[in-house]
Amino acid sequence: MIEKRRHPRVKASIPVYWGLTPECSKHDRITSFSIGGCFIQTTEGARPLTTVYIRFFLSNKGERIIRGEVRYNLEKVGLGVEFVNLTPDDRQNFQTLVDYYLDAQTK
């Protein structure tokens, strides 16, 4: 299988609140992420191109609600989500988090 990702992806296990509205009422887990998107392990489904919202705690910025778009749905497994319209500050914070996980995974 040819890898189509534009950004390095890291494995993780991060509890997360997400949902179809900014209230982010669902509680699941992110199992991998990059500055471009993430995989949410969940039994909830959502069709591709559905807008979702993900509540993150980024660096010293506190809580952020990030908007994403479902790219694929693995039934009863999870959702591949692409982040949409990240601010430059959010991109930098995600890159710092990716670098942290990359460093930890190579040790």
Name what the model sees in each region.
Residues 28-29, 66-71:
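Short beta-strand-centered aromatic/proline hotspots
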